[in-house]
């Protein structure tokens, strides 16, 4: 028998742990809820404090026969849930309600009435994990010993009365693609629930999420109509919200929200705990450009969280709450005929008691569009189609109908240009769509979402200050006449310009209300919160680490190296620390080059930085090529139980690195490719292979 080396032993241990996981169903290491994501009260509707957490009771009280649950991290799944609720109501007469999974308890789901239906719109987050708001529900429903009020066991098929529909949101560049919806579907089926139609799956990695959703929902509605004896009717717009102008109020009134995220912020008394529902208005204490070449800028910012009671750990994420650019706000208001009413005060209320108003109210049209609505996102075909009834003339209506019904035509005219809703309508006609109800715009557009960035500092070195590293997005798509500009990165660049003395910052021609609502962000402040990540250094600093981070993928690894240098300075035994970093040219976009030299001096031969410059030679060289060239080093460190980390592009780089690592293991150990692939998978499941990637 061949002698087992360290990596083989690690794999053997993982197999044993995996077996235990199978038989305990994760009881001892269930996915923890984000400790930084303290739940905040909903603005309207939902299961507020003091309200029932019994979904069946809630449906009976409000006369609903269809509940659409969502597990959402960035708002997309919530948006799809709202769209399904609206369509079910308008086309089929269903009495629908949208429900946040964390607002309810599920011990009585075995009493779900046979004449009702539940939808589950589930995003998969990170490495096959539930979104923050779905953690408790998922742990309950997928548990081996799931217990319902009736006391029935899984063998008794306790959910036999539950009819359900599922749609999953995922990204095929991640290993655990659609894990949530697939695992949920399996759990519900095991418990006897009856799925109606196919389990839908939308793929963000392939860029087909919207079309996947549209293709799935039509046969789903057919199946649901048959199962519940529904009759389709002509869909007529029925507002979910009432929007009324209030002439008794002006923007100067203290009761009016002008962009503040919460009542406390509006009243000038913000207080913690700060979370995804309640950001901290943090001062930016330093900002600079790491490089500025041609069409690209890269920012480094230091954000103070002193006095906020916010904390972070090295490897966590910071969320930046952006503001829409003034030019896009003006365009939107002009397209919908609201330019002259931008400062009119409006009240927004849910017509249905279960409707959750996504915007603080009262507010103004300008504030709603500038601070609360995702107006700069690519528009969906379905949303464009809903505007046909409100077109300014018949010719425009015919074009809108064609765009909404012809997938290829929409792709050619709208998707290829990455048009926002306002740009799409401007491409059809110069006439304003003044007849579109503002309620329809609130319903059809997502709430403006925070953007997450890998923290590029060590909490050990600077616990009250968070570093971020971000490339400013400004991209010209092939065939497009305009630049696609990142909402948040250009906002950050404007803040940097202002902080560094520019009296009128206008990155890529964009301007922002930098001082924020009622000048509350004056002095260069930005709303933030912190999100926990499992992307962490090993607890034993002597353990080797291999990091692969091209471009801004280097961000968390700056924090890792910063921390190891600090530990070494304290006399700790620090293990081999290897970074594979890639960029275009060493004299163009090699960020933190001087800083890394300092860390090299501090860590000596414990730190090795291996670079890949893709544009310096005729043959492009990427980090995966350097990884293969240093296969002996990689293999040696893996035998020493090294942790392996990847940060950056999921679609190409991360996939290639995963493939190359398997090839290195196979080559160095004389193993079949299939066995090496299994070893990489076991590294992932054990936590010794970690990714922080995006597409």
UniProtKB/Swiss-Prot annotation:
CDD domains: CYPOR. Residues 277-538 form the FAD-binding FR-type domain. FAD binds at residues 451-454, 469-471, 486-489, 694. Binds 1 FAD per monomer. Binds 1 FMN per monomer. It is found in: Endoplasmic reticulum membrane; Mitochondrion outer membrane; Cell membrane. It holds the Pfam family Flavodoxin_1. Its EC number is 1.6.2.4. It catalyses: 2 oxidized [cytochrome P450] + NADPH = 2 reduced [cytochrome P450] + NADP(+) + H(+). It comes from the Eukaryota. Signal peptide: none annotated. NADP(+) binds at residues 296, 552, 614-615, 620-624, 656. Residues 66-221 form the Flavodoxin-like domain. Keywords: Cell membrane, Endoplasmic reticulum, FAD, Flavoprotein, FMN, Lipid biosynthesis, Lipid metabolism, Membrane, Mitochondrion, Mitochondrion outer membrane, NADP, Oxidoreductase, Steroid biosynthesis, Steroid metabolism, Sterol biosynthesis, Sterol metabolism, Transmembrane, Transmembrane helix. Its main location: endoplasmic reticulum. This is NADPH--cytochrome P450 reductase. It comes from Aspergillus terreus (strain NIH 2624 / FGSC A1156). The lineage of its organism: Eukaryota, Fungi, Dikarya, Ascomycota, Pezizomycotina.
């Amino acid at each position: 028998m061949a002698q087992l080396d360290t990596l083989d032993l690690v794999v053997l241990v993982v197999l044993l742990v995996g077996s235990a996981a199978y038989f305990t169903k994760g009881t001892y290491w269930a996915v923890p809820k984000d400790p930084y994501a303290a739940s905040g009260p909903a603005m309207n509707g939902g299961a507020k404090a003091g309200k029932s957490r019994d979904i069946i009771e809630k449906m009976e009280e409000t006369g609903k026969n269809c509940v659409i649950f969502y597990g959402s991290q960035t708002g997309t799944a919530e948006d799809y849930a709202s769209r399904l609720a609206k369509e079910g109501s308008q086309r089929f007469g269903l009495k629908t309600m949208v429900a946040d999974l964390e607002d309810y308890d599920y011990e009585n789901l075995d009493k779900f009435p046979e004449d009702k239906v539940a939808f589950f719109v589930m995003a998969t987050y990170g490495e096959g994990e539930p979104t923050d708001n779905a953690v408790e529900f998922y742990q309950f429903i997928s548990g081996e010993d799931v217990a319902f009020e009736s006391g029935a066991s899984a063998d008794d098929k306790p959910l036999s009365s539950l009819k359900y529909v599922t749609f999953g949101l995922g990204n095929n560049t991640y290993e655990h693609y659609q894990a949530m919806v697939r695992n949920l579907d399996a759990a519900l089926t095991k418990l006897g629930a009856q799925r109606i139609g196919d389990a839908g799956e939308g793929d963000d990695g392939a860029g087909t999420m919207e079309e996947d959703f549209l293709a799935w929902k039509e046969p789903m509605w057919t199946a649901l109509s048959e199962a519940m004896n529904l009759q389709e009717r002509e869909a007529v717009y029925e507002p979910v919200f009432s929007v009324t102008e209030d002439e008794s109020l002006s923007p100067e009134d203290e009761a009016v929200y002008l962009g503040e995220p919460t009542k406390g912020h509006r009243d000038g008394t913000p207080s913690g705990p700060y979370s995804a529902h309640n950001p901290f208005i943090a001062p930016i204490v330093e900002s600079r450009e790491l490089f500025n070449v041609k069409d690209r800028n890269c920012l480094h910012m230091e954000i103070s969280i002193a006095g906020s009671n916010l904390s972070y750990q090295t490897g966590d994420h910071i969320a930046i709450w952006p503001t829409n650019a003034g030019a896009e706000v003006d365009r939107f208001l002009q397209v919908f005929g609201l330019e002259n009413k931008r400062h009119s005060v409006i009240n927004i209320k849910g017509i249905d008691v279960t409707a959750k108003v996504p915007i603080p109210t009262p507010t103004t049209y300008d504030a709603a569009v500038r601070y609360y609505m995702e107006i700069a996102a690519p528009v969906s075909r379905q949303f464009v189609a809903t505007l046909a009834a409100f077109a300014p003339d018949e010719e425009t209506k015919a074009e809108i109908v064609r765009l909404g019904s012809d997938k290829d035509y929409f792709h050619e005219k709208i998707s290829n240009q990455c048009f926002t809703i306002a740009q799409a309508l401007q491409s059809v006609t110069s006439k304003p769509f003044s007849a579109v109800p503002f309620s329809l715009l609130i319903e059809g557009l997502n709430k403006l979402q925070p953007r997450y960035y890998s923290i590029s500092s060590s909490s050990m070195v600077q616990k009250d200050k968070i570093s971020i590293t971000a490339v400013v997005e400004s991209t010209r798509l092939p065939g497009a006449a305009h630049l696609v500009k990142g909402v948040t990165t250009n906002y950050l660049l404007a803040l940097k310009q202002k902080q560094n003395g520019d009296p009128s910052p206008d990155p890529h021609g964009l301007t922002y209300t930098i001082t924020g609502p009622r000048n509350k962000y004056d002095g260069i402040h930005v709303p933030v919160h912190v999100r926990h990540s499992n992307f962490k250094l090993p607890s034993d600093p002597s353990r080797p680490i291999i990091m692969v981070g091209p471009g801004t993928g280097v961000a968390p690894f700056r924090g890792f190296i910063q921390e190891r240098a600090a530990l070494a300075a304290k006399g700790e035994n620090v293990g081999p620390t290897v970074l594979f970093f890639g960029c275009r040219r060493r004299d163009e976009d090699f960020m933190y080059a001087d800083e890394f030299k300092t860390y090299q001096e501090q860590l000596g031969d414990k730190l090795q930085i291996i670079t890949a410059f893709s544009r310096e030679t005729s043959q492009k060289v990427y980090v995966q090529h350097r990884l293969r060239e240093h296969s002996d080093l990689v293999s040696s460190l893996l035998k020493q139980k090294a942790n392996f980390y990847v940060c950056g592009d999921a679609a190409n780089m991360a996939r290639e690195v995963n493939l190359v690592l398997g090839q290195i293991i196979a080559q160095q150990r004389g193993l079949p490719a299939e066995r090496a692939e299994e070893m990489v998978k076991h590294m992932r499941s054990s936590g010794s292979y970690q990714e922080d990637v995006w597409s």
